[in-house]
Amino acid sequence: MNIGQLIAERGKPFYSFEFFPPKDPDQWPDFFKMAERLAPLEPLFTSVTYGAGGSSQDATLEIVSHLKKEFQFETMAHLTCVGATQDYITQYLQRLRDNGVDNVLALRGDIPKGQDIDWETAEFRLSLIHISEPTRQAEI
């Protein structure tokens, strides 16, 4: 469900959680145990950050999908666009949709160390409307 709708319908204060996914998949079991302990607080939604330059992008997808399926959290995936191609962003949005993730927080993001970004050719990353349009059947 669209988080904006949830907030509007709620009409009172609520909790939300932002998770930074562990880089090491060996730490995921402890991470999910922590999420399980937080579940009784009934957050209105959870968000999962997204590493720039590929550092935790796939982890975000897996973790946000698991939180939605296992704990029935309404989830929002962060999407950092700096350094990503239009094709990659489109594919990532589709993968989120395929995993039932209806909410995305699209951010420019910080330039990863060692990368030089030409903002004139990267202008599309600042306005994702036309990129995400094909995947907008969900609330992305």
Predicted regions: what they are:
Residues 15-17, 46-48, 75-79, 104-106:
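Hydrophobic faces of well-ordered beta-strands that scaffold small-molecule active sites
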Residues 1-17:
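N-terminal amphipathic alpha-helix/helix-capping segment at the start of soluble metabolic enzymes
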Residues 22, 44-61, 111-122:
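Glycine-rich, proline-tolerant flexible connector loops at the mouths of alpha/beta enzymes
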Residues 129-140:
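Single conserved hydrophobic/aromatic residue that forms the stacking wall/gate
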Residues 57-95, 102:
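Metabolite-binding pocket within alpha/beta catalytic cores that recognizes anionic/polar moieties
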Residues 17-30, 76-87:
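Active-site mouth loops of central-metabolism enzymes
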Residues 1-5, 28-36, 53-73:
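Glycine-rich, positively charged N-terminal anion/phosphate-binding segment
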Residues 85-128:
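Flexible, glycine-rich active-site loops centered on histidine and acidic residues
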